[in-house]
């Protein structure tokens, strides 16, 4: 599901809200989540899961086109860990 598909579905279910209100709310939520992660904080949504940053160590990679070795710097990447209720709901484990 894309962001626009989510907005469309919410508009269909929440007929008392305008499409603009729903779009703004979705954008605000995603922006707050991104800025929270950007500041290094963890996000926990009970029953759904948690978002955090994981550090990837520097490593030597390869350019897939040329096969040349490339030094890759260490970096932080977003990580999602599903909560127990979500795992059970989608039957992951």
Curated annotation (Swiss-Prot):
GO CC entries: chromosome; cytosol
Keywords carried by this UniProt record: DNA recombination, DNA-binding, Transcription, Transcription regulation, Translation regulation
Gene3D superfamilies named among the record's database cross-references: IHF-like DNA-binding proteins
Coiled coil: none
Family annotation (HAMAP family): IHF_beta
Known function: This protein is one of the two subunits of integration host factor, a specific DNA-binding protein that functions in genetic recombination as well as in transcriptional and translational control.
Protein's name in the database: Integration host factor subunit beta
Organism: Vibrio vulnificus (strain CMCP6)
GN (gene name): ihfB
């Amino acid at each position: 599901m894309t962001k626009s598909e989510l907005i469309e579905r919410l508009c269909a279910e929440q007929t008392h809200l305008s499409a603009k209100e729903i779009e703004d709310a979705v954008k605000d939520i995603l922006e707050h989540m991104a800025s929270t992660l950007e500041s290094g904080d963890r996000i926990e949504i009970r029953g759904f899961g948690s978002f955090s940053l994981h550090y990837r160590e520097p490593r030597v990679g390869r350019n897939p086109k040329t096969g040349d070795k490339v030094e890759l710097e260490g970096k932080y990447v977003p990580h999602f860990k599903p909560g127990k209720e979500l795992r059970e709901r989608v039957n992951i484990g």
